């Protein structure tokens, strides 16, 4: 009798994806973050579903409905803070996952990489719209500032902004549509994640050496299921520590003030995971230029595969490229710090230098390091 997991049409798909999947024997803990992203996504969908049962997308009641969730709903506070901090965990895992892809040359799997980039963009849109929903001061002004950026588009900009707003300012129509999109987008993200996995399993996983590992593969279960469970436990431990001890650590105090269109907060800033892009946006004095730099700071990931000049896939044996990579990490941390600072000296010039360095590292220094290393191999 054949095993049901190998013969049943549905279970067979799960078997080929998570049980009998041939996996390189040498993949490190940096490969754990894919499964952690899956856990984050499921967690966000579940907590979001329960929040949506009690939330009202109306400008007059949105703020008080969030307060009601935290005060009156059974364990509402833990659901709300798990959802808010779960987003932070999601982005931490995602940034590490992308960084791993850059370091070990996983971007040579073109379809997987491109779908991953679309995943990132969709997730950023979802998180932005979710931040607007509590209808606090930072929600309202963040929505106003970020949507207003589209007015920099020539000819159609102003009409486009008013079309997105559903009126002449961020108001009830905006909140309602943001709630609708925030609810539906995670399911689109789920579909993207499945497609991402589908393309990955066509080629098989990369590994730290960047060398094809077809001659040395092991089944995913039990080796990597155990490894992923350990990663998941550490993720949940970190998330629960954040939620139970300092749930507002990554939030903004301004968001505990109800939205007031007549009073602008002293420093308008997005959530921490957007600060690097926000710093790039602010570093360019021209509005259209800033918007283009902001878009390109993420879309640049799509052209990374065509900038690969090295004969080796991974950076494991490429010290020059490693230096450039870690310089990029340090630069992104600097941009994140600058994005949260007021627009004044010396932060303006630091932000401008960090922005120039960001694009220079990816567009010039990384390909250059690859060419130099190729020449060093000849010696």
UniProtKB/Swiss-Prot annotation:
GO terms for biological process: mitochondrial electron transport, ubiquinol to cytochrome c. Keywords: Electron transport, Heme, Iron, Membrane, Metal-binding, Mitochondrion, Mitochondrion inner membrane, Respiratory chain, Transmembrane, Transmembrane helix, Transport, Ubiquinone. Heme b b562 binds at residues 83, 182. PROSITE patterns: CYTB_CTER, CYTB_NTER. It is a multi-pass membrane protein. A ubiquinone binds at residue 201. The chain crosses the membrane at residues 33-53, 77-98, 113-133, 178-198, 226-246, 288-308, 320-340, 347-367. Heme b b566 binds at residues 97, 196. Gene3D superfamilies: Cytochrome Bc1 Complex, Chain C. Pfam families: Cytochrom_B_C, Cytochrome_B. Belongs to the cytochrome b family. Heme 1 (or BL or b562) is low-potential and absorbs at about 562 nm, and heme 2 (or BH or b566) is high-potential and absorbs at about 566 nm. This is Cytochrome b. It comes from Dicerorhinus sumatrensis (Sumatran rhinoceros).
